[in-house]
């Protein structure tokens, strides 16, 4: 047996039975195939251990194996480490893979998105930005406008985390240029939503409100409820900053929050955002009339956040 496709025809039992009889790169292929099947069953611990055995065999072969083979194994290790939340292993493995890939001209940018996520989780923001910029250049070479816009948007998110909205905004404006090339209305609106958020963070309220009016109109026409509520909330926050009637704004936010539907993760996250905003506004006023409601809302917020933690587990 010398063709990997033949391995895919074997049962798990046949693979394990024949494993002691094979050696070299073929043995690595056996471990890789067993790892792949474990991954498909969401048994990531077993899949990772099997992929690491496949890697160890290939590394012992040194020059007797191809870069493509070792890259395949490194990606498998990275995917399983990512599924297990082991960001350090993702980084150490895929950094090695990227060096080999660039050297061998086998560098597919989509293979390293989980490395960006790992850098972000470990707060290695500069490395994440550099990798995203590299991905952007790769996608730009093949005129993949969707991915170009996505890379630029991700870069902007990182700069926002670093409180560098002045750098984030030009990145988003460029992302918007690429999004418009796709002629995908929903994608264009998504990037414009990010632009509105950054304009708000930069306290450019008039420009932000002008854009919000357009977004609210578009989301109403398309009946995209979640985004519509978020944009209406942002507009109310601008009105709050302009010293409008604060109690009326709180009541308007409360009314909007009742329109959130669904129990999925996005709906829960949206409820958390609304509850936190209402609590912040009430605490800002410091009125005794909100004392009991504040206690209730803080309890509700804690329950929602606990639900998110349970979901993550």
Descriptions of predicted regions:
Residues 16, 55-62, 95-102, 133-144, ...:
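Amphipathic alpha-helical segments of tetratricopeptide repeats
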Residues 8, 44, 87, 125, ...:
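TPR-repeat structural position
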Residues 41, 77, 84, 122, ...:
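Structural motif corresponding to the intra-repeat A-B loop/turn of tetratricopeptide repeats
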Residues 25, 65-68, 106, 146, ...:
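Residue signature of alpha-solenoid helical repeat architecture, marking inter-repeat boundaries
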Residues 29, 68-72, 110, 150, ...:
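Residue register of alpha-helical TPR repeats
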Residues 1-14, 251-313:
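C-terminal non-catalytic interaction modules
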């Amino acid at each position: 047996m010398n063709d990997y496709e033949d391995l895919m025809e074997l049962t798990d039992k046949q693979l394990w039975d024949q494993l002691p009889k094979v050696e070299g790169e073929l043995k690595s292929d056996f471990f890789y195939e067993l790892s792949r099947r474990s991954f498909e069953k969401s048994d990531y611990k077993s899949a990772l251990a099997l992929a690491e055995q496949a890697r160890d065999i290939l590394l012992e072969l040194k020059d007797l194996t191809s870069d493509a083979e070792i890259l395949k194994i490194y990606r498998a290790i990275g995917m399983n480490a990512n599924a297990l939340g082991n960001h350090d292993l993702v980084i150490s493995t895929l950094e090695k893979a990227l060096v080999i890939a660039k050297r061998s001209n086998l560098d597919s940018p989509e293979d390293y998105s989980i490395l960006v996520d790992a850098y972000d989780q470990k707060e290695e923001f500069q490395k994440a930005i550099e990798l995203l910029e590299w991905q952007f250049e790769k996608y730009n070479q093949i005129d993949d406008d969707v991915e170009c816009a996505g890379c630029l948007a991700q870069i902007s998110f990182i700069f926002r985390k670093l409180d560098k909205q002045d750098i984030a905004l030009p990145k988003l404006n460029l992302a918007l240029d690429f999004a418009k090339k796709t002629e995908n209305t929903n994608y264009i609106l998504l990037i414009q939503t990010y632009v509105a958020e950054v304009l708000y963070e930069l306290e450019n309220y008039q420009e932000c409100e002008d854009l919000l009016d357009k977004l609210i109109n578009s989301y109403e026409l398309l009946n995209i409820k979640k985004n519509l509520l978020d944009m209406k909330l942002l507009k109310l926050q601008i009105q709050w900053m302009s010293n409008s009637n604060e109690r009326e704004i709180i009541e308007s936010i409360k009314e909007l929050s009742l329109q959130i539907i669904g129990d999925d993760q996005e709906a829960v996250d949206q409820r958390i955002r609304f509850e936190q905003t209402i609590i912040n506004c009430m605490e800002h006023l410091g009125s005794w009339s909100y004392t009991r409601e504040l206690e209730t809302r803080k309890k509700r917020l804690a329950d929602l956040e606990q639900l998110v933690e349970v979901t993550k587990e």
